[in-house]
């Protein structure tokens, strides 16, 4: 449900908003590629469901699918490129320590639109090859800190061009496990835990998402066939405009063969082992990797002090969202 903060007014005009979005995307991409040694590649919009390349997200979302009568196959619009990227690193013969980045545009038909969520998803999807010995928390934390520095550096340049922006971000990252959050706030929901913790620690990375906690429930659901649930997490910043924690990136070290089999068993999805992608992983053909997605619209919202994702991207909205934004003077693109 959309809720516009009382008294909210955009710091930028529609024209300046569009110019600032362009600057955010260009500057951040340059900084991120330098920080993580990434090269841009072209990504697919649709994939063949029989390959197992699409992201199953939480396992309940239905990808947009349609038939291709002149090709003789079915197609799915990507929900993310988590598995495709790992395959692409192998196919394009990337070296250890190097990675790729691409613009991911997705349609998530089951998404519940609100201030932060849209049917249309745009993010930077990145993936980098690591060694087996680098499958550890040090590697994960190093990548997180590099991403945070790229974000804060982008904000510094943005505020030089638009001094009316008051966004403040902390470069100091607090790392906390999802179990530690549950122990701190056992009676709160995962979202409430995030808000309570990130309010006090404005740049936070929550480690370990997907596996069941001591309560028997995971902090959040993750597909079992790309992230290692013990070596992944979410990067959140405190958003003063919305007065809540905002997830900017979901990322992690990817599953190896044993972790894949274990997580698929836990999730009751062992049938996926028959798919081409999963067979390649089990057979040791795919490289060890770390990767993630960074929300383009989310980042623009955060840096430009926007109250609704529709102020920085064009999509289709429900009637309630359109009415509330109109009443508050919020211009949806």
Residue ranges and their predicted role:
Residues 66-68, 90-96, 116-118, 166, ...:
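A general structural signal for short secondary-structure junctions and capping/turn motifs
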């Amino acid at each position: 449900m959309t809720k516009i903060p009382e008294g909210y007014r955009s710091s930028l005009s529609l024209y300046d908003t569009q110019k600032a979005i362009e600057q955010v995307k260009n500057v951040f991409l340059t900084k991120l590629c330098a920080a993580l040694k990434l090269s841009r590649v072209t990504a697919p919009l649709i994939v063949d469901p029989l390959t197992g390349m699409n992201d199953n997200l939480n396992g309940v979302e239905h990808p947009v699918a349609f038939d291709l009568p002149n090709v003789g196959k079915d197609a799915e619009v990507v929900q993310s490129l988590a598995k495709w990227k790992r395959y692409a690193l192998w196919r394009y013969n990337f070296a250890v320590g190097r990675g790729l980045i691409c613009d991911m545009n997705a349609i998530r038909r089951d998404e519940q639109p609100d201030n932060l969520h849209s049917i249309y998803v745009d993010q930077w999807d990145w993936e980098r090859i690591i060694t087996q010995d680098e499958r550890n928390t040090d590697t994960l934390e190093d990548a997180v800190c590099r991403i945070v520095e790229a974000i804060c550096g982008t904000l510094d340049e943005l505020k030089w061009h638009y001094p009316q922006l008051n966004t403040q971000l902390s470069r100091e990252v607090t790392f906390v496990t999802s179990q530690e959050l549950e122990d701190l706030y056992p009676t709160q929901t995962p979202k409430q835990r995030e808000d309570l913790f990130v309010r006090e620690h404005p740049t936070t990375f929550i480690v370990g998402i997907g596996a069941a906690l001591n309560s028997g429930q995971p902090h959040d659901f993750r597909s079992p066939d790309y992230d290692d649930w013990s070596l992944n997490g979410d990067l959140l910043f405190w958003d003063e405009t919305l007065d809540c924690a905002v997830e900017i990136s979901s990322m992690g070290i990817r599953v190896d063969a044993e972790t894949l089999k274990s997580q698929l068993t836990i999730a009751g999805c062992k049938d996926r082992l028959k798919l081409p992608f999963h067979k390649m992983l089990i057979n040791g053909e795919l490289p060890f990797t770390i990767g993630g997605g960074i929300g383009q619209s989310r980042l623009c919202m955060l840096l430009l002090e926007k109250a609704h994702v529709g102020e920085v991207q064009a999509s289709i909205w429900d009637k309630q969202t359109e009415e509330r934004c109109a009443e508050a003077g919020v211009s949806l693109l």
